[in-house]
Every structure is written in C-alpha cells, then in structure tokens.
Regions:
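N-terminal positively charged amphipathic segments used for targeting/anchoring
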Residues: 1-37, 42-49, 53, 62-63, ...
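Terminal hydrophobic membrane-targeting helix
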Residues: 32-128
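Extracytoplasmic/secreted envelope proteins and their assembly/folding machinery
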Residues: 52, 56, 72, 76, ...
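Short secondary-structure junctions
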Residues: 80-86, 154-162, 206-210
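Extracytoplasmic segments of membrane-associated envelope/inner-membrane machinery
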Residues: 98-184
C-alpha cells in the first residue's frame, strides 16, 4: 500500500515537472517570436470589379506590425470602404501568414439610378456599365423586391421574357416593364398567379399585339385590359382563359 502511494506521488511529481517545463518552453517561444513579422499574405475570393491595386495599397498601409499585434479591425474597416467589397475576413495563420478572404457584391439590378442591388437584396453604391434591370420602390422593401424579381423572372422565362423595370408603390402595388417594352400592372395580391395569367395570354393573344401595347392591366378577376399605344384606340378588355 505504501509502495503504491509512493509510486503515485512520483508520477504526480513528474507530471507537474513536465507541465512546468512545457509552460516555460511555451512562454519562451512566444517571447522569442514577439517580433515575428507577417511574411506572407494570401488573398482569397472571386471578384470582377474590385481593383487589385486598391487591395495592394490597403495591404501595404494597414498590414503593419507582427503576427501578434497586427490590428485586424483597422485593416478590415479599410477593406470594407472599397465600393465593391461586401464583406472581408482577415485571419492569422501560424507562424507568419495573414489570410484575407474577400466577398464581392454581385449586382442584379440598379436602384433608382443612384445605386445597385446585390443578390442578397442589399443596396450598395458603386458604378458599372452593365445593362441591369431597374428597381423602383421603398428602400426598406428592397429584399422583398429582390425575391419578387426572381420569382417573376422565373415565370417570364418560359416565353424568353425578363424584367427591365420592377416597381413597388408606396401602397405596395406591383408593376413591371418587360424587355420587349410591355408594362404590366399586377396590383397588390396574387402577383404570381397574375404573372402566370399574363404569360398564358401572351402566348395566344398578346404576342401578336406586343408592338401596339402601352400596358396590360392584370388586376381583373376573370380577365385583363390592354391599352394600345395609339391614342385613337380605346382601352380593350379581353377575357382571359384562366
């Protein structure tokens, strides 16, 4: 019994010494590397609009200090100021690397001519010459507009049509203009079913009139109305085949 206790004490003592040595070694290692510089910077992410030269300038200015005292917050804030940067992640990688992962805004539309809308339904300010559809509506409904834009475009694609302008009024009434210059009034309710009705009637009725159409009003329960571009023609109401 005494021998067993003696053995346990010895093992405990040895473990204590081992832990103590490891701690001393670790502290010494950190102390000796207190001035460890960042020797390699890895840039990750796919981007088309972000200027690589701007990334390099920010890296040179803000990636200062060693592995331990590098101010990642300031560097991240600087990257976030670039027009096309949606998000950025900076991460230290032992022993001397900094990994920068950049997420670029992916534009899907213009916002009333003063900004752009990304695929997450967020408005951002940047410039591009891309031919993009236009969103017009209350700014706090941009996410809803993004969802509705995709939903309607998916239905229109059956006839190789897509949205050039989508509008949401202050009273939350929807309206679109297609790439073949047809304005479609959809109203507040049953928007998807009204778009489907528009496509169904487009195939059999509206396609032949498209060059003459000013707008199509789909807010009728069992039909729709068409206003022709020529002023001498009065509004014409057609029964849909729903």
């Amino acid at each position: 019994m005494i021998n067993s206790l003696s053995i346990i004490k010895r093992i405990t003592y040895l473990l204590f010494v081992l832990i103590f040595v490891c701690v001393i070694f670790l502290v010494n290692h950190i102390f000796n590397h207190a001035n460890l510089p960042i020797n390699e910077i890895l840039i990750k992410g796919q981007y088309q609009h972000i200027d690589r030269e701007q990334i390099n300038l920010i890296t040179e200015e803000y990636v200062q200090g060693n592995f331990f005292n590098l101010n990642l917050y300031e560097a991240r804030s600087a990257f976030k100021q670039l027009p096309w940067v949606r998000d950025v992640d900076l991460r230290r990688k032992w022993p001397d690397q900094l990994v920068i992962t950049i997420e670029e805004h992916k534009p899907i539309a213009r916002w009333e001519g003063i900004g752009l809308v990304n695929d997450k339904g967020e408005i951002f300010i940047a410039s591009t010459e891309e031919n993009l559809p236009i969103f017009v509506g209350p700014e706090n409904f941009v996410k809803e507009m993004t969802i509705k834009f995709r939903e309607i475009n998916k239905i229109l694609a059956k006839e190789l049509i897509h949205i050039s302008i989508i509008k949401l009024s202050e009273r939350l009434s929807w309206e679109i203009k297609t790439n073949n210059f047809i304005r479609v009034v959809l109203g507040k309710k049953n928007v998807s079913s009204r778009v489907k009705s528009f496509i169904k009637n487009y195939q059999f009725v509206l396609a032949e009139l498209k060059s003459e159409i000013d707008y199509v009003d789909m807010r009728y329960r069992d039909g729709f109305s068409v206003r022709k571009t020529k002023k001498k023609n009065k509004d014409k109401t057609l029964n849909s085949t729903i």
